[in-house]
């Protein structure tokens, strides 16, 4: 559950799996990844070097580790239902399917949201993470991460990339 180790390890595994699939003859015509998976996709598509990807992922993990607060919950509902119920301080971190999303953010505000979810018959489960990733709580580290990213060489993709960001 410690992001400082988990993120680099996830990247290494995802990149290695992608390289193995390519070695077996799988020829992707488009790449997609979520969170750390986007770094693996960028690397496999030739947009960034493995060395730069490791630097980005490791620095990202260190910055996010320093925040170390907040909660994440998997919520069984549609975005259109959740958005009006979502208080300030929480974010939709991921839309995994039409009726399964992840809500992330401030721990105290999350408790209020969970009460609202209970009142509306919405089921949920806590994700065991060390912080509220993909939420507004990560905003304080954006400037520092941008400084790291400015040092990286980005190349045109050799394989198309589908971003999971909106």
Model-based region annotation:
Residues 47-51, 109, 141-145:
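Short, hinge-like loop/turn segments at secondary-structure boundaries
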Residues 1-88, 96, 120-132, 136, ...:
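FabD-like malonyl-/acyl-CoA
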Residues 110-122:
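Charge-rich, low-aromatic oligomerization/scaffolding segments with amphipathic character
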Residues 82, 92, 110-113:
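Hydrophobic, small-residue-rich alpha-helical packing segments that form membrane-like cores
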Residues 91-93, 151:
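A generic local secondary-structure boundary/capping motif
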Residues 99-104:
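A generic structural motif
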Residues 79, 105-110:
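Helix N-cap motif at beta-to-alpha junctions
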Residues 83, 132-166:
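Conserved, helical-rich catalytic subdomain that frames metal- and/or nucleotide-binding sites
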